[in-house]
């Protein structure tokens, strides 16, 4: 991970990195805490998952001089984690299979029969569905998702995997692609691009220092580095969207609806039940 390598080079502090899907990150942190094994210093993952760790009382109150550079939404009232970057749910498409001008202006355009057998979604994106329904209203929103279910999109777990399958041409269009994943693959020469089809849903990603971090000073130093202009510029260079207002990005110049991680968590049972019925129990 370039961010970890840059930190090691600057401070001479060795970083041991473990990467996994967000649910696995939470599972490991909770399991180890229950076993009184405190091996994790810092967690960087999705906002709702950080909210889960906060409610499990595994994180510590967060302070950094770089919080002043962040938008108001980046720091929850409890200060147990802070947003360091953003993820946007966009339409990723294989440039060998789909021309940009073919893409509809809104998600409802993908209900056209010509897209059947060409669409993919990520298996855990109930919050994307919930946000579209809130934006559109229940009747219009549920009508869309029932019809989308009938299109039988290819459901895959993992946003990186979804983007990889789009780039490989196995899935022509990923409806819930993270623009950061598509952008990084595009910059490496992959046949993939993305478009902010409305309505675009945005979710904060964040970083938390664990309450029982075995190396608390190094953990705080790493968190500061991630939030610093240097760390945020590095995010930007990798095709990520930094949270800092001091670092410009060309990857968020469109209208979007921001989800609140605490609300996502509070309503997760309701929306996941609907999502599972529509897309996972097939």
Regions found by a protein language model. Give the residues of each.
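Extracellular/periplasmic bilobal clamshell ligand-binding domains
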Residues: 249-282
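A ligand-binding cleft/hinge motif common to bilobed small-molecule-binding domains
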Residues: 49-52, 172-192
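The catalytic Nudix box helix
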Residues: 1-13, 253
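Extracytoplasmic ligand-binding site segments that recognize negatively charged/polar headgroups
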Residues: 1-4, 16-26, 30, 38-170
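Periplasmic-binding protein-like
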Residues: 69-73, 87, 115-124, 146-149, 153-156, 226-247, ...
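Short amphipathic alpha-helical coupling segments at ligand-binding clamshell hinges
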Residues: 3, 13, 140, 144-147, ...
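A bilobed periplasmic-binding-protein/Venus flytrap-type ligand-binding module shared by bacterial periplasmic
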Residues: 90-97, 133-135, 204-218, 234
């Amino acid at each position: 991970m370039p961010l970890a390598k840059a930190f090691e080079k600057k401070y001479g502090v060795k970083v041991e990195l473990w990467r996994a899907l967000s649910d696995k990150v939470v599972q490991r942190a909770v399991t180890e805490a229950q076993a009184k094994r405190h091996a994790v210093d810092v967690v960087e993952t999705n906002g709702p998952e950080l909210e889960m760790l906060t409610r499990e009382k595994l994180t510590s109150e967060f302070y950094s001089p770089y919080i002043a550079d962040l938008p108001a939404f980046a720091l929850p009232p409890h200060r147990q984690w802070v947003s360091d970057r953003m993820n946007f749910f966009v339409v990723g498409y294989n440039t060998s299979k789909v021309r940009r001008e073919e893409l509809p202006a809104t998600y409802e355009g993908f209900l056209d029969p010509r897209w059947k057998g060409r669409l993919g979604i990520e298996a855990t994106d109930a919050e994307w569905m919930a946000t579209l329904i809130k934006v559109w209203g229940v009747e219009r929103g549920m009508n869309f998702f029932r019809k989308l279910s009938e299109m039988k999109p290819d459901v895959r777990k993992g946003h990186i995997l979804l983007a990889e399958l789009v780039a490989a041409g196995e899935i022509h269009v990923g409806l819930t692609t993270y623009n950061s994943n598509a952008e990084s693959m595009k910059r490496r020469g992959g046949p993939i691009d993305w478009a902010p089809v409305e309505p675009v849903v945005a979710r904060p990603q964040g970083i938390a220092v664990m309450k029982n971090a075995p190396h608390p000073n190094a953990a705080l130093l790493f968190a500061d580095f991630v939030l610093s202009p240097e760390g945020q510029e590095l995010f930007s260079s990798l095709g990520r969207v930094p949270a800092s207002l001091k670092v410009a990005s060309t990857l968020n110049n469109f209208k979007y609806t921001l989800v609140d991680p605490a609300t996502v968590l509070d309503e997760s049972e309701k929306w996941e039940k609907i999502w599972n019925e529509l897309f996972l129990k097939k």
